[in-house]
């Protein structure tokens, strides 16, 4: 594989093990990336197994050509939030044995300065997962009011200096528009000092802008609900998150569907009726990468894997 598509998949063994793969099963890799998880899933599938991958990054679709000769594999160009629609179009709703979701930005996306995700490499201020559509980060910064910008930084980046950063960006953009990642990163580094060791002051702002312009959290909500619709009984859901906002959504989703409906005290509803509303059960505890994996791949250090199983309908 070319270096362009090289990528170390995070929690690879643990994530695929969580799927409890059947050789003749049907599986969804909702975040294909550069194919690391898909390759591992295919190793566990027999001749009659099937893997459907999804990704909205055009470069990921190109990377999927590595599996062009494998009849078990197919890929859809689109967002993982629409996975239920894609599966339903294939007539596979309720027949899927496992769904894998990895919410991290792939290393090739971060390392390619032209994609505009990295504050360490100068490139166009883009940040779109699908760079064929939607507004760029530069366009968003140019158009957004100070209060709205501060809200995004605080909500999606958990940035404590959100208002100060937004005001400084607005003051500077009135003189010269922000078109490059280095221009934005350098401004934030000048006005803010990160109190977190080995963390660039622009980390949270870049995260916030990326999440916002790609509607990432909305996509996560849609993908989780979609997985619930397409999974067969005893089907597995393996989800990797990379920051607290993502993990909080996944944790609450699994908890909500594991507990069933909340019933006010005194209502004549039986335990059996409540059990019918329990759609998932958590499988094991949240898993974090080993010390060895973090040493080999520093980008894995914040990852968390959660696994759940679809209960009977």
Curated annotation (Swiss-Prot):
Cellular-component GO terms for this entry: cytoplasm
Any one Gene Ontology BP term: rRNA base methylation
The protein's Enzyme Commission number: 2.1.1.199
Transferase among keywords: yes
One GO molecular-function entry: rRNA (cytosine-N4-)-methyltransferase activity
Keywords: Cytoplasm, Methyltransferase, rRNA processing, S-adenosyl-L-methionine, Transferase
Record's subcellular location: Cytoplasm
Broad enzyme group: transferase
Keyword Transferase among UniProt keywords: yes
Residues that bind S-adenosyl-L-methionine: 35-37, 55, 80, 102, 109
Superkingdom as given in the UniProt entry: Bacteria
InterPro entries associated with the record: RsmH, SAM-dep_MeTrfase_MraW_recog, SAM-dependent_MTases_sf
Catalyzed chemical reaction(s): cytidine(1402) in 16S rRNA + S-adenosyl-L-methionine = N(4)-methylcytidine(1402) in 16S rRNA + S-adenosyl-L-homocysteine + H(+)
Predominant location: cytoplasm
NCBIfam families according to UniProt: 16S rRNA (cytosine(1402)-N(4))-methyltransferase RsmH
Function: Specifically methylates the N4 position of cytidine in position 1402 (C1402) of 16S rRNA.
UniProt similarity note: Belongs to the methyltransferase superfamily. RsmH family.
Protein name, entry field: Ribosomal RNA small subunit methyltransferase H
């Amino acid at each position: 594989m070319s270096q362009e598509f090289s990528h170390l998949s995070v929690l690879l063994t643990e994530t695929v093990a969580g799927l409890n793969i059947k050789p003749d099963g049907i599986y969804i890799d909702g975040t294909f990336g550069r194919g690391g998880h898909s390759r591992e899933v295919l190793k566990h599938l027999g001749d009659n197994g099937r893997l459907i991958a999804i990704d909205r990054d055009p470069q990921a679709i190109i990377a999927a050509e590595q599996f062009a000769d494998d009849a078990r594999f197919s890929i859809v160009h689109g967002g993982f939030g629409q996975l239920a629609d894609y599966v339903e179009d294939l007539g596979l709703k309720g027949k899927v044995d496992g769904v894998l979701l990895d919410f991290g930005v792939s290393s090739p996306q971060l390392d390619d300065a032209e994609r505009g995700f990295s504050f360490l490499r100068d490139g166009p201020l883009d940040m779109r997962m699908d760079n064929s559509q939607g507004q760029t980060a530069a366009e968003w910064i140019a158009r957004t009011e100070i209060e709205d910008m501060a809200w995004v930084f605080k909500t999606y980046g958990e940035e404590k200096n959100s208002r100060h950063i937004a005001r400084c960006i607005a003051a500077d953009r009135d003189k010269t528009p922000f078109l490059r990642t280095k221009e934005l990163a350098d401004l934030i580094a000048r006005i803010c000092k990160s109190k977190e060791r080995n963390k660039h002051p622009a980390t949270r702002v870049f995260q916030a802008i990326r999440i916002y312009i790609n509607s990432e959290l909305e996509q996560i909500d849609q993908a989780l609900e979609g997985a619930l619709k397409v999974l067969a009984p005893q089907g597995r859901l393996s989800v990797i998150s990379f920051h607290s906002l993502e993990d909080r959504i996944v944790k609450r989703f699994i908890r909500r569907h594991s507990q069933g409906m909340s019933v006010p005290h005194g209502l004549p509803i039986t335990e059996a009726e409540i059990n019918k509303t329990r759609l998932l059960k958590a499988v094991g505890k949240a898993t974090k990468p080993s010390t060895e994996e973090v040493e080999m791949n520093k980008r894995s250090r914040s990852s968390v894997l959660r696994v759940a199983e679809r209960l009977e309908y």
